[in-house]
From Swiss-Prot:
Catalysed conversion reaction: 2-[(3S)-amino-3-carboxypropyl]-L-histidyl-[translation elongation factor 2] + 3 S-adenosyl-L-methionine = diphthine-[translation elongation factor 2] + 3 S-adenosyl-L-homocysteine + 3 H(+)
UniProt-recorded name of the protein: Diphthine synthase
SUPFAM superfamilies: Tetrapyrrole methylase (SSF53790)
Role summary: S-adenosyl-L-methionine-dependent methyltransferase that catalyzes the trimethylation of the amino group of the modified target histidine residue in translation elongation factor 2 (EF-2), to form an intermediate called diphthine. The three successive methylation reactions represent the second step of diphthamide biosynthesis.
Molecular-function annotations in GO: diphthine synthase activity
Domain of life: Archaea
Assembly notes: Homodimer.
Length: 267
């Protein structure tokens, strides 16, 4: 049997169902390349699920390409788990393994975990149904990511917030920070609207070092944050309740809160 198990954004997010399954399997592949879980360590995992099994700290090459068939073959003979940061199939990274296992007639069980998609609206008080398409901002090494800006513009035109995931290149030990992202966004902003729009900086969301800051997007770079993972929410025109949450929950400065409490225009 093959388990796909969500780790959440902290090792403390593992559910009882997840821990029970991890205790029962013979081998655990720990996905180490799709996200950073700040408080995760193999020692902590072993203390929760026991050491009488094989642990593999899996880089990209372990879980993609030709190795998919190896993992599926293993799962045909014994119980295997792939432990994934966040929720296993919010992104499509491991879909090929699931499809191949099912094609071979191998049982697959998914145990869900907490994801930034649920935590971001919950922690900030922004309404989940007012989020548009999520997009990733990558480092502009070979090209400028104008498609990211176009997605943000499309969402704003429909009065929808944008959850902006920031580039992670874990195997290169490189992770984009909120200040870096702000500089890139303002450089790409041909409309000149993003600088003064409300942004929410999310650092280590869901961990004990979590930091959430709301301010003008341009001013998010002036705060100190714990190390990545970082994300940003580009806020469309907020509902009055959302505006209250941005102020009282996320620390939106008083002068911005008061301005948009009475203003009919945004930003």
């Amino acid at each position: 049997m093959l388990y796909f198990i969500g780790l959440g954004l902290s090792i403390k997010h593992l559910t009882l169902e997840a821990i029970d399954a991890l205790r029962d399997v013979e081998k655990i592949y720990v996905d180490t390349y799709t996200n950073i879980v700040p408080d995760f360590s193999l020692d902590k995992l072993v203390s929760l699920v026991g050491e009488e099994k094989e642990f593999v700290m899996a880089k990209r090459e372990f879980l993609e390409g030709k190795n998919i068939h190896f993992i599926v073959e293993e799962a045909s003979k014994k119980n295997i788990a792939i432990l994934v940061p966040g929720d296993p199939f919010i992104a499509t990274t491991h879909d090929a393994i699931r499809v191949e296992a099912l094609r071979r007639g191998i049982k697959v069980k998914v145990i869900n975990g907490l994801s930034i998609y649920s935590l971001a609206p919950s922690r900030t008080g922004l309404q989940a149904y007012k989020f548009g398409k999520t997009v990733t901002l990558v480092y502009p090494e070979y090209f400028k990511p104008y498609s990211t800006i176009e997605t943000i513009y499309d969402n704003l035109d429909r009065n929808l917030h944008t959850l902006l995931l920031l580039d992670l290149k874990i195997e290169e030990n490189k992770a984009m920070t909120i200040p870096e992202a702000v500089d890139i966004l303002i450089d790409l902003d041909e409309r000149g609207v993003l600088e003064n729009i409300i942004g929410v900086g999310l650092a280590q969301l869901g961990s004990s070092m979590e930091k959430i800051v709301a301010d003008r997007l341009a001013d998010l770079k002036n705060y100190t944050y714990p190390p990545p993972p970082h994300s940003i929410i580009i806020v469309a025109k907020p509902h009055p309740i959302e505006l209250d949450n941005l102020h009282y929950v996320c620390g939106l400065p008083e002068h911005i809160y008061r301005r948009y409490s009475v203003s009919k225009t945004y930003p």
